[in-house]
Amino acid sequence: MAQKPNFLKKIISAGLVTASTATIVAGFSGVAMGAVMQYNRTTNAAATTVDGAGFDQTGAGVNLPVATNSVITANSNNAITFNTPNGNLNSLFLDTANTLAVTINENTTLGFVTNVTKQGNFFNFTIGAGKSLTITGHGITAQQAATTKSAQNVVSKVNAGAAINDNDLSGVGSIDFTAAPSVLEFNLINPTTQEAPLTLGDNAKIVNGANGILNITNGFVKVSDKTFAGIKTINIGDNQGLMFNTTPDAANALNLQGGGNTINFNGRDGTGKLVLVSKNGNATEFNVTGSLGGNLKGVIEFDTTAAAGKLIANGGAANAVIGTDNGAGRAAGFIVSVDNGNAATISGQVYAKDIVIQSANAGGQVTFEHLVDVGLGGKTNFKTADSKVIITENASFGSTDFGNLAVQIVVPNNKILTGNFIGDAKNNGNTAGVITFNANGTLVSGNTDPNIVVTNIKAIEVEGAGIVQLSGIHGAELRLGNAGSIFKLADGTVINGPVNQNPLVNNNALAAGSIQLDGSAIITGDIGNGAVNAALQDITLANDASKILTLSGANIIGANAGGAIHFQANGGTIQLTSTQNNILVDFDLDVTTDQTGVVDASSLTNNQTLTINGSIGTIGANTKTLGRFNVGSSKTILNAGDVAINELVMENDGSVHLTHNTYLITKTINAANQGKIIVAADPINTDTALADGTNLGSAESPLSNIHFATKAANGDSILHIGKGVNLYANNITTTDANVGSLHFRSGGTSIVSGTVGGQQGLKLNNLILDNGTTVKFLGDITFNGGTKIEGKSILQISSNYITDHIESADNTGTLEFVNTDPITVTLNKQGAYFGVLKQVMVSGPGNIAFNEIGNGVAHAIAVDSISFENASLGASLFLLSGTPLDVLTIKSTVGNGTVDNFNAPILVVSGIDSMINNGQVIGDQKNIIALSLGSDNSITVNSNTLYAGIRTTKTNQGTVTLSGGIPNNPGTIYGLGLENGDPKLKQVTFTTDYNNLGSIIATNVTINDDVTLTTGGIAGTDFDGKITLGSINGNANVKFVDRTFSHPTSMIVSTKANQGTVTYLGNALVGNIGSSDIPVASVRFTGNDSGVGLQGNIHSQNIDFGTYNLTILNSDVILGGGTTAINGEIDLLTNNLIFANGTSTWGNNTSLSTTLNVSNGNVGQIVIAEGAQVNATTTGTTTIKIQDNANANFSGTQTYTLIQGGARFNGTLGAPNFDVTGNNIFVKYELIRDANQDYVLTRTNDVLNVVTTAVGNSAIANAPGVHQNIAICLESTDTAAYNNMLLAKDSSDVATFIGAIATDTGAAVATVNLNDTQKTQDLLGNRLGALRYLSNSETADVGGSETGAVSSGDEAIDQVSYGVWAKPFYNIAEQDKKGGLAGYKAKTAGVVVGLDTLANDNLMIGAAIGITKTDIKHQDYKKGDKTDIKGLSFSLYGAQQLVKNFFAQGSAIFTLNKVKSKSQRYFFDANGKMNKQIAAGNYDNITFGGNLMFGYDYNALQGVLVTPMAGLSYLKSSNENYKETGTTVANKRIHSKFSDRIDLIVGAKVTGSAMNINDIVIYPEIHSFVVHKVNGKLSKAQSMLDGQTAPFISQPDRTAKTSYNIGLSANIRSDAKMEYGIGYDFNAASKYTAHQGTLKVRINF
């Protein structure tokens, strides 16, 4: 409220001003306005306006006051006094050649004041104390001037009828403010502007300004005399202005606001303007006491376009001259107008919201000698022409628009320039303006958004040595003018422009300065790509691994001498993002801490080339690697210096080019099979070096390629590979054939993967290993030149190898094969031998084949020793054809595998015969060698012990002669071939006794006469081929050690009948021995507890199996000759043992085992031919193994012969032991001897016995009808279920399977179905019982019940004739197993909704609909079976009142049921495993019926009503026919007839008096009934499986006939409209219980 008077004052003041202005306008309009007559009053003496004295009059002695709007024409040399209160006169017209005094004694308004006709004279005004003179400047038109009238109302023209322009104040002289407060106000009716101001001439001076107030209310006024600066108070209104273009006080200076004077900017907006014009001959310096403008008001312009000038804070430059720094103390604006050569100097602090720098022509300069601050949200604009601003202290220019002008802001050393600078706010496409720092300085944002500082200006410069700190976003070029110039970029700085691209302002030269980073930064343009000296000396990244320098330029140029990008101790990242095709980084990359720093060029594509023309890191004693270099998919060239990179990342098949320098690349990261390394040494410097520890690619992610570029001048390009260097690439290739050599001379171990040379037929040149270097090649290798291995170096080969030759001049080189797969080494035959290798070492499991091409006379490789090492067990080394074994040292350290799996490395010789003599080193006792013949040549062994076996690569190839044995010292060899199935030697001859500790795999083996061969041992125990006993006489011997495995087709023969012995010293598989016409002398089996497998026939004068167990492994095995002794088990399997002739004696330990395969009828038999006899006492147990997987669905008995020719069997078989395998448990077996003395096996069907026994031991043993149904099932042997059952392996599974089929749940489902309908009938009885009371006076005072027979709830008495009711209910019932019938658990939920009415006083009728859902879970042996019943019922019901207190009630019901059943069935798979399946039934059922009850009501006690009741109920359920689905073999078709039931119902209910509790009436009730089934039956359902001939019989009804009910209820009524009820009932019968809850809602109408 305190503000209201001021507010009202402003309103009133505004109204008065408006009214006054309107009056003036109307007056000046004169006749045209038709309002007031305009007069021209002339003076003739001292004049006063209020009475008109001294003016022309209407007559003598009459003083007519000067009227409003009159023009006063001064004709006499007399003073004029304006004393009309609030006088509003048109103007003053000087028409006398005198300067006149004008006194303002009352507030007066004047239009023009002119001396147009007397220009040498003026009006000197004196304004009285507290009075005001308001100048409107209003002129008159020619029409007005010609029609003005005198006091006599006669036309008296002004200015001879000529017009006087608006704002003509040429007649103003001095203005004397006599006493405070005197006011001079300019309220121009035609406001002037700065461009055309109202000008007060040189004669317009101020006298006693200390008493005055100057108001510039409307218009722009220019003053020419310094005295105006002495006015005590100057007020400038909004959008109005005052211009000082005045004489100076002294020495060209004008003092403003001295002596307490003030210049104020009034108005709400504070947009008044003060213009200070510097002009030669006038004031050029303006000394300001205090400051101009403030509180965001006042626009001050300093104009030096005519002459250089200075705006000075009188208190010194450290004081404010424009605005103040106290919150909102800034001036609204500050404009500096300059011109070329006419500079403006501001010697004081400037605080203005907006600053404008404008130069009339290019070259204007403004110097701020102290602070400049536009504050938050302030702005600076440059206009008109190019200009230069020099600041001396910190400056804040805010949002600065260079206006597309060549503006330069110069910042001195150690000062801060604040602002947001834009080249052209109107067109962002233009770039203009330069910010120049003399040395140290800071450029920061002056906006609330600190990010954007510079937008599209030409440049930010550093002229001298110093650090300029930048932050935010700068759209400008950075220029460095001194070697010591540094730009320091804060975290997040963005430079949208180049660095050192163009010369500094005034074409000052660029210099190799530096850039330092305090955090992440972005530079989008080229760096150092300008003229001479543009290259930068240093770029130093932030000492923070997380910070990133993003460079988007295509040329990043450093100084030739020492130009470097420095990664500090913690690293940092350089990100290269240029989209240009060619990108050059001409800097060394200096790394402070090993494995730090990142260069990220991941955004580059394969169309771009990145060149790093400088060193990266340091290689040497103090190696420092760049942490990571990601080249993206670009072509990256690393030249002009050594390179040390910890991780080189290549994406999308990028490539890196290595020139003639040294490169350390600890690791490459690339997608598998991507990335290329190009070895591109220049024509003069042909060598490229990979420093120790380099890894190109990896085993998991090899490079795509390592490539030798176009050959150098000398024809080759050499890659020198340091210690531990690994090269992983798919291919190592060359552009030119025979160019590219790999030299490993630094020691250590290296790996080279991929294919080396040979692509498109272009081979590499050569390979050199020296100085103890180990190199492992993983892929195919192709060199045009030779391979040299010296200085104890090792060449490891994993794949095919092509080279001219392999040599070791100092005989120290090792060629090692580490291949896992077969490989070939291809060499060129030579004219002479090269240096011999120390050794060839085989270390891998793959085979190696040497191959030579060409026509030379000397082998391309020579070696002293061959050694098998590491994983070479089983590997084969194929020597060059024509290389003999005679002089080679052959060693092994790989052993020979396990005892059961002998193995050996293999040396293959071909194209030449070899001889092995004593003293030659071949293997040792723990490391056996395998020698193999690769051609049809021979090996002669004269060495007593040869730690080797001999093999062949092709069957019937190679001859071996063994002569190393001496008397009492048989020769030793480790096998002739390895095992059955291997290629066979063509011929083996034993000339001396021999122990062969291996197998014999040979087409022909000859054991000379009188020579004994013992064969089999650690190297093998197989025999495949033919052994001939004796060279002539047949008297040779062969012994087979334990576990001899003869091939079934093997043969042992003698050169003479009944000569030669064969002995088995242990277990054996035996082939053919002798023949029927040339039997051998003896065949003996001498081992203990051993067995023999007979695969062929034996013909010998004497066969002695000793206690061996015999297994017959061929379909027919013949034993022939003289005598045969057997005293062990004979296992026939399913084969025949034929005794062809002679006598066979079976000892006491003899037993017989045979196998019957029922599926094909095969059984092992003994066949005793006509010429043979078998003598045996009673044998041991006869084991009969039966594999019975055949179907048991057969009838009768099947027979199989065990001994044929039983009449020639002198003995008795022991009691049989049947060992049945398979899944057939339904068959019985026996062994008998028939009439012809043959022994016979019998097989009999036993299904009925197995099933009956299984069911008798199961849970369904006592289920009613189950045994009858099982008999029916087993009679139908053609059903799928029957045949599936025969797959069972477990009798308990059989009982489960058949029990699920032979039992059912029909009785339970039918019972529950009828019970559900009965529940709905009971609920209808509830309603009938209630309505009956409406017509019975005996019940009028007793709460009604709705409990009918077997009811489940109580109802209150109805007091209305009709209503709608709903009763939801929930029932849980459980029937335990009874009479062998499986029980069940049932849950029923439902609701009945009815509508009824009274037909008359004694008859009620109604209809209802009910919905029920019952879930049945069957129990006991039917557990897991489920049935769901959904019912929809429709009912009619009624009640009739008979004679007093007697009544009848009844109902009829019709129910539609949807029944879904899920019954468990089973299925056996082929392995006899039982799997559960679900047989689903889905059928509809109809149930209908009705009931009729009679009863009597009487009041037994006061308030107690007893109602005995009795009646009958009848229900009937329809037939069902459906087929189950869902099982494989056990779906049944079901057909059932109807079910029905007649029940007698007897019981009573007792209803108590109503209880009123808070107007809520409660009616209690209790009841009990007995229900007895008097007639009816459940349906006898019939079911059949597909293919079944007779139906199953359904299980009978075992439920109790009598059940009992007791229940209680309560009905609640709150008003006549609504009733609610709740009830509970319990039902019980034999092994049956049920609980039911009921709710009720009823609306009475």
Curated annotation (Swiss-Prot):
Disulfide bonds: none annotated. Residues 1357-1645 form the Autotransporter domain. Residues 1329-1352 form a propeptide. GO terms for cellular component: cell outer membrane; cell surface; extracellular region; periplasmic space. Keywords: Cell outer membrane, Membrane, Periplasm, Secreted, Transmembrane, Transmembrane beta strand, Virulence. Pfam families: Autotransporter (PF03797), rOmpB_passenger (PF12334). InterPro entries: Autotransporte_beta, Autotransporte_beta_dom_sf, OM_autotransptr_brl_dom, OmpB_passenger_Rickettsia, OmpB_ricketsia. It comes from the Bacteria. The 120 kDa surface-exposed protein is a major structural protein which may play a role as a rickettsial virulence factor and/or immunogen during infection. The 32 kDa beta peptide may serve as a membrane anchor. Belongs to the rickettsiae OmpA/OmpB family. This is Outer membrane protein B.
